[in-house]
């Protein structure tokens, strides 16, 4: 069996194995939307090892920023897309790859299972009504499944409290392609909103984001940073990975400003200072 995975196989056998792996993924997880480039890219990364979060994330530097990549089907499917990413799909992709590498799993089917667990409530089958649309819900659900852990101490720098009050999706239905096409789903989305409304979480206000020993102890390289917002009806405005440079904390993210995945040249403090609607950060650790 070792000879069959040594990379010395004839091309036709490698192709046969790859097709079998893709078929297995579809059979196990129902409808999965992906290209051959995506599936082979996943397997290549899984086989290469090197499971540090930032090492995996940096493989995607330069990948184009594209929004709404999960809305490409009339009905919800598990979408795997390594060619185009928004801030959330970038984080989910990296996290699913990391979990597979940490477990020694090297198949596309294993990756699809990990991604589904991260993206949908309780790891449910792909269903728009079960997708973790709000990042507070995403963090709570993934913490409950042992995927990430909230970081909310010490105080300082976690000096502020966010009280969640979301309704943006149900009050802006026309902004969401699939929800607009399925108005009967609105009550289910409202239930998701109600699950987190009223909850309180400690966070670091942007005034506390400084290049200090304390902050370096509280926020680690590869932590997931959720940038909070004061936009009515929303909890989170942007997400990415924490990266420490000599001059302070930076964000590795799929950027709509730069139109690609970048390691933001500005410090996070400078970045937040340019956006009045951004109030601070919450942190979770893979």
Language-model-detected regions and their locations in the chain:
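Short, well-ordered loop/turn sites that connect or cap secondary structure elements
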Residues: 218-219
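C-terminal soluble interaction/assembly domains
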Residues: 223-286
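Acidic/His-rich structured neighborhood in mature extracellular/periplasmic domains
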Residues: 65-202, 244, 253-256
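Bacterial N-terminal signal peptides that target proteins for export
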Residues: 2-17
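Boundary at the C-terminal end of the N-terminal hydrophobic targeting segment
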Residues: 28-32
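Short alpha-helix capping/helix-loop boundary micro-motifs
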Residues: 204-215
